[in-house]
């Protein structure tokens, strides 16, 4: 995993993942579980998706996205990540597990689910305006988030189901995102 270099949160997650994997190799006697989660959604979640729906953003009838980009996105419910964390602590399982609900939602579909109209915008204009809004402290996220939204991580959850023994109850579909 390389993360998204211009979005520090993503970059740091990838660095921590690499360090944990190195530790796991150097200390096989220690049980290490690395959980790579997709975007968590639910009524108690505070993350980038929930911030995009808060004031003043919720008053806009549209949401910008990079023209030509309609990436597939995955989600994981609060209930599922809670169960996965519990099982990781209680079980003897070891290794790296990708955690996401089954299926994907396209970014423009997510925008419509949020009750907005997708507004395609040239990449340079969107990056520049987001950087300016971040610098002015008017946006809750830096322009680097656009890379994560253009090139999101889509997980293969086979090991979660077969080795870890858990299949998320909620899927990455319209019903779960709402």
Residue ranges and their predicted role:
Residues 15, 46-50, 65-89, 95:
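Substrate-positioning beta->alpha
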Residues 4-33:
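Active-site Tyr-X1-5-Lys
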Residues 11, 73-79, 105, 155, ...:
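Residue-level signal for the nucleotide or nucleotide-sugar donor/cofactor binding architecture
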Residues 2-10, 65-71:
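A short acidic, glycine-rich active-site loop
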Residues 161, 170-178:
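Amphipathic terminal alpha-helices
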Residues 23-73:
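NAD(P)-dependent short-chain dehydrogenase/reductase
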Residues 144-157:
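Active-site loop of classical SDR/Rossmann-like NAD(P)-dependent oxidoreductases
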Residues 81-141, 157, 178:
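Mid/C-terminal beta-alpha module of Rossmann-like enzyme folds, strongest
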């Amino acid at each position: 995993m390389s993360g998204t270099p211009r979005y520090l949160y993503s970059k740091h997650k990838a660095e921590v993942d690499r360090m944990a994997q190195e530790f796991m190799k150097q200390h096989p006697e220690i049980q290490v579980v690395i959980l790579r989660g997709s975007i968590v959604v639910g009524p108690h979640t505070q993350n980038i998706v929930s911030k995009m729906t808060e004031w003043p953003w919720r008053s806009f009838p549209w949401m910008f996205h990079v023209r030509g980009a309609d990436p597939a996105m995955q989600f994981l419910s609060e209930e599922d990540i809670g169960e996965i964390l519990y099982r990781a602590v209680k079980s003897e399982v070891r290794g790296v597990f990708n955690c996401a609900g089954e299926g994907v939602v396209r970014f423009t579909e997510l925008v419509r689910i949020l009750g907005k109209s997708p507004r395609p915008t040239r990449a340079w204009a969107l990056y520049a305006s987001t950087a300016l809004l971040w610098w002015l402290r008017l946006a809750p996220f830096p322009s680097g988030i656009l890379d994560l939204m253009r090139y999101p991580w889509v997980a293969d959850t086979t090991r979660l189901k077969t080795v870890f023994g858990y299949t998320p109850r909620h899927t990455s579909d319209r019903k779960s995102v709402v």
